[in-house]
Amino acid sequence: MQTTDPTGIFNRNKLSEEFSNVLPDEARLKLDAILLEIQTDFPEICYSLEYLNTKFRSFLTPQSTCGQKLESLFQAAAELTTAEAPKWEFIAARLLYFQFSFHLKQEETRRELSDFYKKLVYLTRQNLYGSYILEHYSREELLLAETYLKAERNNLFTFSGLDLLLKRYVIRTHDHIPLESPQEMFLGIALHLAMNEKNDRMLWVKKFYDMLSRLEVTMATPTLSNARKPYHQLSSCFIDTVPDSLEGIYRSIDNFAQVSKFGGGMGMYFGKVRASGSNIRGFEGAAGGVIRWIRLVNDTAVAVDQLGMRQGAVAVYLDVWHRDLPEFLQLRTNNGDDRMKAHDVFPAVCYPDLFWKMAKEDMDQNWYLMCPHEIFQAKGYHLEDYFGEEWERRYLDCVQDARISKRTVTLKDIIRLVLRSAAETGTPFTFNRDTVNRMNPNGHAGMIYCSNLCTEIAQNMQAIEEVSKEVQTTDGDTVVVTVTRPGEFVVCNLASLSLGHLPVTDTSYMEEIVSTAVRALDNVIDLNFYPTPYAKLTNQKYRSIGLGVSGYHHMLAKHGIIWESEEHLKFADTVFETINYAAILASTNLAEEKESYSLFNGSDWQSGAYFEKRDYHSEKWLALQKKVAAQGMRNAYLLAVAPTSSTSTVSYTH
């Protein structure tokens, strides 16, 4: 299609004139400058303003207000986006930002917020910003931070990314009026994450801001949403081990409610809970099984809906040898007894290697389902506390023990149930427990039973245990004091490297950006508002972080790498080895600067087994292994490739 206005002057003037009577002169001149900038930055004929002008006018009516005209302008650009002309999405973002900044400026003027410091004071008084920012930074430091703002980085957004960011992440008043720009959001997050830095604090503020505003690294949604705010729950993932007791089960459900209240997702391991028909205090057939408890979890997920924003999210895990497995595999299917359904949870199954080994040999072999409580009564141990060859030996021993009741099914029947559920509901998720525990760098300190909601976290777990309840008198009042052992309530803090925006072949740059991201995530541990004290204790014990990636396909496309090629495999190995090396280097350097996590001694990090298990034998890796053994590690767990459905949209990387 050939344009009739090659210079664009006519159409730029026509678009600008449409706002001559509805926009102040300053805003109209700014709009004209943006249109000129669009012409300069997108000179191809398919991005001619003639197309924008024509589409824009098709939306107008004689009654169109200023706000409707501004909305029509960016909607027109968005609708021009096609596979042949994809950059209209960037043009639409610039026009959307013009509309947003126009209204933001009006609100700032009305409230006399003439600089960043005054805005923070106002937001703090309105309880929209946490008071800790003003308590930790001086006015001079905050005005210096304002100079870091780079408005031109708004041009990195696409329309869909900017639209999502403005709707979900920027701070709004209690009546939903936005009072924060995207760049101020990134700066506010950076100020929060650098708050406790003792040396070169403002340098770290700038580094964190640059990393985020260039869209090179995205923090997880809880961090983007809640950093800088009064209730700064910054973690994404939590995992709890549900104990086999009435008090313990309800405590786990309460913990899930607290996590969901502040926007976290949850994984819950039900493999310790006795099966349906098992005994309670010697009364045979009294136990209702795991399904009834999972239904309570389901109702909690629906009820605790994060201030009406979205319902809670939870994955429930069960071992493939648990006697309630057949009913568990039908939790979300549409047929069967609705009293045995839980449609709002995500079931997941934990498999030992033996299951797959037997299935490969002969799927008609029998598989035995047992109750963990009956196993403990008969054998004196918890089968789920073992993995690998030791688990196989004990499982086969339990199979031969006539004191333990069993449900006998064929492997084929179990796999058929799994596939039927997967086809109908997309679940159950899969967790290969032996593989995970073999590679666990902290196996000396515990056991991993399951993963989290999104199945990317694997850390040591332990059920919370009640020790005692005592009646005491405190300040003249009678109180009941409950003493509990905190167990290990897993929590992880996430961020993702935007591979499509990074020079992944530049090793020094990657080491620098990974080091900055690791430091930011490590700071989250100390700055976080924890929904439960158990989460805080575990996070401070292990200092686990989850640095992941997004934009994998984006990266391959940028480098012209074909998916089904040997080059792809080699390239992926190189990129992820670079990331892993840089993350370990950053963590050991942090350990030297601060200190190691408390359970470093005896870990695979200290012994070098971590490197041996992964065949890291090059000179570079051997040097790092020695460095880690000498300096320690700041974080027990480092990498986790988490889903990034929202943040990858914001950062425009796929």
Where in this protein do the model-derived segments appear?
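Extended catalytic cores of very large enzyme megasubunits
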Residues: M1-Y652
